């Protein structure tokens, strides 16, 4: 028999959980978006097909697609204007975490757990489907001007994680004048502008506010809650850049 007192306690517990004050059970979480990171370069002739695929993924509601341009192709005749040493370092960290022998482009990393050649669509889609079945933390993200507010609920028996802020441009178009893609007009979607750690999640309910000039009105923002910095992504949220 359900008593009125029991019912009120249940309602209060549910309200507290929604507010983030009650830790989630270890297996309890939402089915949020899957994070796909493409490591690419405008100097790589194998990358345009992967760039096009990422642009398609960027239009999906169940995927957070991010394009990380690496700098180790720059010596081949064309300096990718969006390449960043930090992006190459992030890819190398994944290499070590996943036990890979080398870094390469185009590479897609899915939820920080698995990887595939970026232009092999079927392989990447299988990884996305598998990732979508895993429970994940429901991450809240609100932006006002150059300030964001991030909320992450608590979870029992959780390992510490880094909260990353990734700022990205919607689309960049570049006429490549040298290198393997000389003469091509390269279209890159969700090009990463900056990546920065903005906090740590220790398993307890978290709310943090962060302000950065990088959060310009014409850029998008993604927040990744990721174990060990470049380990499995536990949850993520995104604010899309404007369409015009």
Q: Which stretches of residues belong to each language-model region?
A:
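Active-site-proximal cofactor/substrate-binding loop regions of enzyme domains
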Residues: 2, 27-96
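Short, conserved sequence motifs used for protein processing/export or organelle targeting and
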Residues: 81-105, 113-244
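N-terminal export leaders
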Residues: 4-9
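Sec-dependent N-terminal signal peptides
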Residues: 10-16
């Amino acid at each position: 028999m359900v008593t009125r007192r029991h019912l009120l306690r249940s309602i209060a517990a549910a309200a507290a959980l929604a507010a983030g004050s009650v830790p989630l059970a270890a297996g309890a979480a939402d089915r949020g978006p899957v994070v796909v990171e493409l490591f690419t370069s405008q100097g790589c002739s194998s990358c345009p097909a992967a760039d096009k695929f990422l642009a398609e993924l960027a239009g999906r509601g169940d995927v957070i697609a991010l394009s990380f341009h690496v700098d180790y192709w720059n010596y081949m005749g064309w300096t990718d204007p969006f390449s960043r040493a930090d992006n190459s370092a992030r890819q190398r960290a994944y290499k070590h975490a996943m036990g890979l022998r080398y870094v390469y482009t185009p590479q897609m990393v899915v939820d920080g757990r698995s990887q595939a050649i970026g232009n092999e669509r079927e392989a990447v889609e299988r990884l996305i489907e598998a990732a979508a079945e895993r429970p994940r933390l429901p991450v809240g993200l609100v932006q006002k001007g150059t300030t964001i507010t991030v909320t992450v609920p608590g979870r029992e028996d959780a390992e510490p994680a880094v909260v990353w802020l990734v700022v990205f441009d919607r689309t960049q178009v570049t006429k490549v004048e040298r290198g393997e893609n000389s003469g091509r007009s390269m279209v890159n979607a969700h090009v990463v502008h900056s990546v920065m750690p903005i906090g740590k999640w220790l398993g307890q309910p978290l709310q943090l506010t962060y302000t950065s000039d990088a959060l310009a009105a014409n850029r998008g923002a993604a927040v990744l809650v990721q174990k060990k910095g470049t380990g499995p992504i536990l949850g993520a949220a995104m604010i899309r850049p404007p369409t015009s």
